[in-house]
């Protein structure tokens, strides 16, 4: 069981690093090139990103209910597909409305594929024994900015911002999706949802404050 939790932690940690690096940490690098290419102001580019945050907040509770019923694997797998779709749309954007649309799609993926979904997945799998897995996932994904910013910057300077978005989309399909497909299948719905919910809330608070769960 311990080995299974370790494998799950590593797979989710790697998948989370990819998801954060290719979404939350992307505008810091690509906002400038996007604004110059499309004729948008910096503020408008970040306004589009704010739409993603709003959509993500609205999507999160729905994703949580789906994870409660079906387990995290199908939800996280779907998030990789939606991430890839959103990044592809962004790579093809030629006007402001396209950028907003792409980030709205990205918001759907963020709401179903970032920390809250990963935490809910391990709680759904391991119940009160999920705390160490949550800590491990947090430690892995803590490197998302360390990986994402320099990699996005290098790709943008070497190939361009559109190609950078496409490469991140490809990574979701060839790396993130297989990692999530290989996650354990969830068993029957837990009999103590209150305890599970408390564990998720505690984990989220710990991430927000920088403490270990």
Segments (PLM) and residue ranges:
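Interfacial helix-cap and linker-helix signal at transmembrane-aqueous boundaries
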Residues: 34-35, 66-67, 147-159, 164
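Hydrophobic core of transmembrane alpha-helices in multi-pass small-molecule transporters
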Residues: 17, 86, 97-113, 138
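Symmetry-related core transmembrane helices of the 12-TM Major Facilitator Superfamily/SLC fold
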Residues: 163-182
């Amino acid at each position: 069981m311990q080995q299974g939790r370790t494998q799950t932690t590593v797979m989710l940690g790697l998948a989370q690093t990819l998801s954060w690096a290719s979404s939350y940490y992307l505008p810091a690098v690509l906002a400038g090139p996007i604004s110059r290419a499309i004729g948008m102001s910096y503020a408008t580019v970040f306004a589009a990103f704010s739409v993603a945050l709003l959509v993500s907040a609205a999507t999160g509770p729905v994703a949580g209910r789906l994870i409660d019923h079906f387990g995290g694997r199908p939800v996280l797998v779907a998030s990789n597909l939606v991430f890839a779709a959103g990044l592809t749309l962004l790579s093809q954007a030629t006007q402001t409305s396209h950028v907003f649309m792409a980030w709205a799609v990205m918001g759907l993926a963020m709401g179903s594929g970032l920390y809250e979904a990963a935490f809910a997945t391990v709680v759904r799998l391991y119940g009160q024994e999920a705390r160490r897995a949550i800590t491990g996932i947090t430690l892995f994904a803590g490197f998302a900015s360390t990986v994402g910013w320099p990699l996005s910057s290098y790709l943008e300077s070497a190939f361009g911002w559109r190609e950078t978005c496409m490469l991140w989309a490809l990574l979701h399909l060839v790396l993130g999706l297989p990692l999530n497909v290989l996650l354990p299948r969830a068993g029957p719905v837990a009999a103590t949802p209150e305890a599970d919910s408390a564990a998720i809330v505690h984990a989220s608070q710990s991430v927000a404050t920088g403490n270990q769960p």
